[in-house]
């Protein structure tokens, strides 16, 4: 591309051009023929060319044709419609680095002499490091700068009585000639609803001599009204009398509309950071502050005089003041950009975190002129970050520790084992001891859950006091503990440790005046690190523990290979299940859910059943687990879904069908398509299908599973969270994903209405459902007193043997028909 001379390029006075060039965001102005009229230094750096090589050229001179075509189409749209265009895209900058830029293009009218032309103003914002909250803040900065630096203003003067003496030619934008605004004629262009307030403010300034700063609407030549801001100050004689008023009228319509749109958006979607304040400051060459924007003054409560010089430092939080002064004035001395986060004292009390960014500005001859900068309020982002870090820490701990005893869980054990594996020799022998508290359930039933919990804590304390610091103690389930010892020398040593643990635990307990005896059984497995993985060790120790349970309290069993017989039996079940699924030997039963206000059946939950030819009915908990282990859960789940949809089509249109989804089904990226195909093939309306998930779906590969859930919900399917309340994160997922229904786990219903704790939890869930507009369902209702309680608490639906157990499809249909006939008879 050859350098050319272009007479139509934009020129500015040196100070204004220096300020534009000091702005770190690229600014580009094109004429109606899409030629570059102006590029600031940042834009030249982005393109990687000198300004003199760009002025007068078009995108086609510096970009590939396809990319230039895209920009040309965008520019044509901006010029023809006048609508602002914003696009975010990756840009390769000189040096090969790729940055993400948000480019905003708008149309402006450029007047030079008696002629005017449309120009395209493009401003780019780098949002690479701060794409979240800071992106909104930076966008606000660019918009504010475009208003203050590029939009024309209308100057005016008035005599001490307030009569307008002269006004700039751009007053014609109101549809009135400038001469018509003289005297008090400006009022003709003003919106009637704003005129009274403006006249009062003007009269107040005339009476006191205080500056005028007022916003109002003026007529637009093309029709309607636009928002403007007028500011004015006085020139006084030596005796203090006012000689003349000097003011400007600034078009703030776009900014006003933007702020109003942002407020509305924030109220509607409760977004944050889109309308955060932007504070602008300018310094002279000596570092003394010459100007602070109105937003700075409003935030800090300072006046312009108080903020001048080094006075702005008085608004900095005392704990940050010395560091801020040192960093900023060092940057001034070195003429280097500055960026720092610190706290400002708020005018109304408290403090606000800001990120302050300053850039040196230079004259065309290289003379240092001072700094221009912005301060952005990032209080919400800082607070959210602190809360997020704290929540992450808590979640990390909760995910790896038992809430009751504070002991690590299986996940912690696995991570700790991996860490140890990097520091011990392959030949090092390890021992895993699985301990089961024999008779704990009887103690829990006899003395109550509180005593049982207290007993578990006492057992934990004894084990902690006995074990070595290098041992790892975990609680895997209600009454099962695991001990990992590294560096065991022999099987005899492992058995001795097991006996010592039994002796420690079986010593008598005194719990709140109650004497309690407890027995323990131990299953252990020992191997070198290179022989078995941790999961294999735990698995073999579990096998030994199951054998130990048959021997009663005090029994110790060490794993032997012959104990794998049970595993082989389980493998046979896997083969049998695969055969049953292929031959269609499985069945789907349907358990009713009833509306608690009308008593009407609204839903049937589809439940898989396996009538085994030899074993009889196989427990769903058993064969579902086998299906998940073998990968059969995918085809099994799809079969259940299709069977349920096929049957539900036959029911009345007000009756839905609920199907449970296994977390493993979400590993199939086509799950949403499977649901859609089942609905289309069977003809079932999507609103009559309810899919129930447990929160483990959201714990594993949360982002991917959430996306799948969103795709399913977009089909119109109802999504319910099952077993609500059994995990620590249930509440957080109500905020993460808009569930349609909550199903309260049966464990909270069993003790109703006697258990105050269960009643409090049930009441809280009902309140959450009402607040969020979510349907609330209770599982496991088997007694009338339970039903009366949940009705009183305001639940919507209930399920349980009080309403009916799982039924074959024909009986479910018969039940619906009988209900329908009863209802018809009652009418």
Curated annotation (Swiss-Prot):
Residue intervals of the PAC domain: 212-264, 338-390
Limits of the PAS domain: 12-82, 265-335
Annotated EAL domain residues: 570-820
Residue ranges of every copy of the GGDEF domain listed in the record: 428-561
Gene3D superfamilies cross-referenced by the UniProt entry: 3.30.70.270, EAL domain, PAS domain
Alphabetic keyword roster: Plasmid, Repeat
InterPro entries: Biofilm_reg_signaling, EAL_dom, EAL_sf, GGDEF_dom, Nucleotide_cyclase, PAC, PAS, PAS-assoc_C
Name of the protein described by the UniProt record: Uncharacterized protein y4lL
Source species: Sinorhizobium fredii (strain NBRC 101917 / NGR234)
């Amino acid at each position: 591309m050859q350098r050319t001379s272009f007479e139509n390029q934009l020129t500015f006075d040196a100070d204004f051009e220096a300020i534009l060039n000091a702005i770190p965001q690229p600014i580009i102005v094109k004429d109606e023929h899409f030629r570059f009229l102006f590029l600031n230094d940042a834009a030249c750096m982005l393109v990687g060319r000198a300004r003199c090589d760009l002025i007068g050229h078009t995108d086609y001179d510096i970009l590939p044709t396809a990319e230039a075509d895209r920009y040309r189409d965008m520019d044509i749209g901006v010029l023809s419609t006048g609508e602002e265009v914003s696009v975010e895209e990756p840009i390769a900058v000189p040096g090969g680095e790729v940055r993400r830029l948000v480019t905003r293009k708008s149309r402006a009218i450029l007047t030079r002499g008696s002629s005017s032309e449309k120009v395209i103003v493009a401003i780019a914002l780098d949002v690479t490091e701060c794409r979240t909250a800071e992106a909104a803040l930076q966008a606000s900065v660019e918009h504010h700068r475009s208003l203050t630096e590029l939009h024309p203003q209308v100057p005016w003067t008035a005599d001490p009585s307030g009569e307008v003496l002269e006004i700039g030619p751009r007053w014609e934008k109101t549809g009135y000639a400038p001469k018509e605004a003289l005297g008090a004629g400006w009022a003709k262009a003003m919106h009637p609803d704003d005129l009274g307030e403006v006249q009062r403010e003007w009269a107040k300034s005339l009476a006191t001599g205080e500056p005028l700063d007022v916003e109002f609407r003026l007529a637009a030549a093309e029709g309607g009204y636009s928002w403007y801001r007028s500011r004015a100050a006085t020139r006084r004689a030596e005796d203090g009398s006012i000689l003349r008023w000097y003011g400007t009228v600034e078009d703030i319509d776009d900014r006003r509309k933007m702020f109003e749109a942002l407020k509305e958006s924030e109220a509607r979607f409760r977004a944050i950071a889109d309308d955060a304040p932007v504070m602008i400051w300018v310094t002279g060459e000596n570092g003394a502050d010459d100007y602070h924007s109105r937003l700075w003054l409003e935030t800090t409560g300072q006046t312009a005089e108080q903020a001048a010089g080094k006075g702005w430092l008085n608004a900095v939080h005392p704990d940050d003041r010395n560091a801020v002064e040192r960093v900023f004035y060092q940057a001034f001395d070195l003429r280097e950009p500055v960026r720092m986060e610190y706290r400002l004292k708020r005018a109304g009390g408290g403090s606000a975190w800001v990120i302050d960014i300053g850039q040196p500005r230079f004259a065309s001859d290289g003379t240092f002129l001072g700094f221009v900068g912005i301060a952005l309020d990032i209080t919400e982002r800082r607070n959210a970050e602190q809360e997020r870090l704290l929540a992450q820490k808590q979640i990390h701990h909760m995910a790896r520790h038992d809430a009751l005893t504070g002991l690590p869980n299986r996940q912690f054990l696995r991570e700790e084992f991996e860490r140890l594996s990097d520091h011990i020799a392959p030949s090092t022998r390890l021992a895993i001891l699985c301990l089961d508290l024999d008779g704990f359930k009887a103690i829990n039933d006899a003395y109550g859950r509180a005593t049982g919990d207290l007993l578990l804590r006492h057992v934990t304390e004894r084990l902690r006091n006995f074990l070595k610091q290098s041992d790892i103690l975990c609680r895997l389930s209600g009454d099962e503990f695991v001990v990992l010892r590294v560096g065991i020398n022999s099987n005899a040593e492992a058995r001795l440790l097991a006996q010592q643990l039994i002796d420690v635990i079986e010593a008598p307990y005194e719990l709140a005046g109650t004497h309690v005896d407890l027995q323990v059984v131990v299953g252990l497995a020992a191997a070198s690190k290179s022989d078995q993985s941790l999961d294999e060790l735990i698995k073999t120790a579990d096998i030994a523990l199951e054998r130990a349970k048959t021997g009663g309290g005090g029994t110790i069993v060490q794993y032997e290979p012959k104990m794998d017989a049970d595993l082989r039996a389980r493998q046979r079940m896997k083969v049998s299940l695969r055969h049953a699924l292929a031959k269609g030997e499985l069945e789907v039963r349907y358990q009713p859910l009833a509306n608690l206000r009308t008593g009407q059946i609204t839903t049937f939950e589809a439940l898989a059943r396996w009538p085994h030819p030899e074993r009889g009915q196989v427990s769903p908990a058993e064969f579902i687990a086998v299906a998940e282990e073998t990968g059969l859960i995918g085809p099994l789940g799809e079969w259940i879904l299709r069977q349920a949809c096929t049957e539900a089509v036959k029911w009345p249109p007000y009756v839905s069908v609920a199907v449970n989804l296994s977390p493993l089904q979400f590993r199939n990226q086509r799950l949403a398509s499977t649901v859609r195909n089942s609905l289309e093939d069977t003809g079932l309306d999507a609103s009559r299908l309810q899919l129930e998930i447990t929160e483990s779906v959201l714990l594993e590969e949360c982002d991917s599973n959430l996306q799948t859930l969103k795709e399913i919900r977009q089909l119109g399917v109802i999504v319910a969270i099952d077993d609500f309340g059994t995990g620590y994160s249930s509440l957080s997922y109500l905020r993460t994903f808009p569930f349609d229904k909550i199903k309260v786990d049966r464990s909270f219903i069993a003790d109703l209405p006697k258990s105050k704790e269960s009643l409090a939890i049930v009441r809280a869930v009902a309140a959450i459902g009402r607040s969020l507009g979510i349907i609330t369902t209770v599982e496991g209702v088997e007694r009338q007193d339970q039903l009366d309680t949940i009705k009183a608490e305001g639940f919507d639906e209930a399920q349980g043997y009080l309403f009916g157990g799982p039924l074959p499809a024909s009986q479910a249909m018969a039940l619906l028909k009988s209900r329908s006939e009863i209802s018809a008879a009652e009418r």
